[in-house]
Amino acid sequence: MAAAFLPSILVPLVGLIFPAFSMALFFIYISADDITES
């Protein structure tokens, strides 16, 4: 099967990179909101 390598790419991407990216984006959003409020 040609797509046999897909799980080895998608699992770290969804399991590690996506949560780290969303946490960083959320942290930046909170920080920017905190700066504008004060």
From Swiss-Prot:
Disulfide bonds: none annotated. The keyword Transferase does not apply. GO terms for cellular component: chloroplast thylakoid membrane; photosystem I. The chain crosses the membrane at residues 10-30. SUPFAM superfamilies: Subunit VIII of photosystem I reaction centre, PsaI. PANTHER family: PHOTOSYSTEM I REACTION CENTER SUBUNIT VIII, PTHR35775. May help in the organization of the PsaL subunit. This is Photosystem I reaction center subunit VIII. The lineage of its organism: Eukaryota, Sar, Stramenopiles, Ochrophyta, Bacillariophyta.
